[in-house]
A protein has these predicted regions:
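N-terminal core-entry segment
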Residues: 3-256
């Protein structure tokens, strides 16, 4: 047995080592997204965000009628009164993470949600529910919500593309859930920053993305089921919920 008395602790066999190139790429993307988040939207961007919001709203109302969404919505009754975010399809309010879970599930229920072809994802199904839930809890104005959405879409697209898009599927993971967590976390970070009257920073985004990565989920097993698996619908809800939590945990200094 080797005795270590000084210096850094010994590395475990097979322990991952941070790739400098990946660290640099993450910092570069975070810096870009921070600039997007802190800049006012152009007229064209504002109109695009409004259309995405309207599209998500209509699709989600339809999706809220599906049995899986209704069951999860009713399951959230135990969380009624835990927050100020409306839970879609119910008459109660709950913590933003719970509201985002239900809304995200509804948004992805009919495969009519928006699609980013390169990263094989449905950004709005994860980003918009998370942003709306946090916006409700923080009483954010529409302008702040739209800016948060723009930053969330930018982050999800860039991070998803850098991760390889289809490669994620080949490894057995559902991109909407995995990448959606990052986009949702970004949008929520923006809303929290605006509420505090602060700028979105690169380091804060990186912290939130670290928590999003730690929660990454969504297996492609549903695609192997003979009749398909409706758990796929919940994957967007997971992405939305994880993003809300990632943004909150990014502000906890001891949780890094």
């Amino acid at each position: 047995m080797t005795e270590h008395t000084t210096g850094a602790p010994p590395r475990l066999a097979g322990e991952l080592v941070a790739d400098p190139a990946s660290v640099e790429l993450t910092a570069s993307i975070a810096g870009h997204v921070a600039r997007v988040a802190n800049a006012p939207l152009t007229g064209a961007d504002t109109e695009a965000a409004r259309k995405l919001l309207l599209d998500n709203f209509i699709v989600s109302l339809w999706g809220a009628t599906r049995p899986w969404t209704r069951e999860i919505a009713q399951w959230t009754r135990r969380f009624a009164g835990t927050g100020a975010s409306p839970v879609l399809g119910t008459d109660w309010l709950a913590d933003p993470s719970i509201a985002a879970l239900v809304h995200g599930t509804a948004a992805h229920s009919y495969e009519l949600d928006d699609t980013h072809d390169e990263i094989l994802s449905h950004p709005g199904a994860a980003i918009i529910p998370a942003a709306l839930a946090v916006a409700a809890a923080t009483d954010a104005p529409q302008a702040d919500l739209l800016r948060a959405l723009a930053a969330g879409y930018e982050a999800m697209a860039l991070l998803g593309a850098s991760a390889g898009g289809m490669e994620t599927v080949h490894r057995g993971f559902h991109p909407t859930s995995v990448f959606g967590s990052f986009g949702a976390a970004t949008a929520c970070i923006c809303l929290h920053a605006r509420q505090r009257g602060e700028a979105v920073t690169r380091d804060l985004l990186i912290a939130a993305w670290g928590h999003a990565l730690s929660q990454a989920c969504g297996a492609m097993q549903f695609s192997a089921e003979p009749g398909g698996g409706e758990v796929k619908r919940v994957h967007a809800g997971y992405g939305a919920r994880n993003g809300v939590l990632a943004a909150e945990f990014a502000h906890l200094p001891a949780v890094t």
